[in-house]
């Protein structure tokens, strides 16, 4: 039995689930009756995790956004992890949505501070885009998991490498 247990807190997105949500949203876009006759498109830039929505009607842009977010929820991706980057108008209305797939330094500090303030007997350290949490008892690690889930973060939090 190990003398110290640990796990990593990460915000990594499953790229395959992102792609599956995109494919499902595209399929729904083709079959929706209220979108017939209106030029609408959904594209995914997998490298940057950006959804590019475009429509000839500004009102239908929000419908496209709702479709994408509902499909992401069904695929297990936290809707709070989706940020609206830009909204453009012209001949076509465009909207870019970014899926946050990393813990930035501000959120890492917020998580680390919450763990330290909880007075649990754990050690936490920021390691790039992950936070390593270590403790002698697994119960303390489970308490930290619960604490982090209850924080109101706009990330898709996941726990990996529980040892």
Curated annotation (Swiss-Prot):
Top-level taxon: Bacteria
A molecular-function term among this protein's GO annotations: nucleotide binding
Alphabetic keyword roster: Nucleotide-binding
Nucleotide-binding recorded as keyword: yes
Disulfide bonds: none
Alphabetical list of InterPro entries matching this protein: DUF520, UPF0234-like_C, UPF0234_N, YajQ-like_sf
HAMAP family, per database record: YajQ
Role according to the record: Nucleotide-binding protein.
PANTHER family: UPF0234 PROTEIN YAJQ
Family statement drawn from the similarity comment of this UniProt entry: Belongs to the YajQ family.
Protein name: Nucleotide-binding protein C8J_0350
């Amino acid at each position: 039995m190990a003398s110290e247990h640990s796990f990593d807190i990460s915000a990594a997105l499953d790229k395959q689930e992102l792609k599956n949500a995109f494919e499902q949203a595209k399929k729904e876009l083709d079959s929706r009756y209220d979108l017939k006759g209106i030029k609408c498109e959904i594209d995914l830039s997998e490298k940057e995790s950006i959804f590019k929505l475009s429509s000839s009607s500004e009102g239908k842009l929000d419908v496209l956004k709702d479709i994408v977010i509902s499909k992401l929820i069904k695929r297990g991706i936290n809707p709070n992890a989706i940020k609206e980057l830009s909204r453009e108008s012209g001949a076509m209305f465009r909207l870019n949505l970014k899926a946050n797939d990393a813990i930035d330094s501000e959120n890492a500090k917020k998580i680390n501070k919450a763990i330290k303030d909880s007075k649990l007997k754990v050690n936490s350290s920021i390691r790039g885009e992950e936070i390593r949490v270590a403790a002698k008892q697994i119960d303390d690690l489970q308490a930290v998991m619960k604490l982090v889930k209850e924080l109101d973060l706009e990330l898709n939090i996941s726990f990996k490498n529980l040892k």
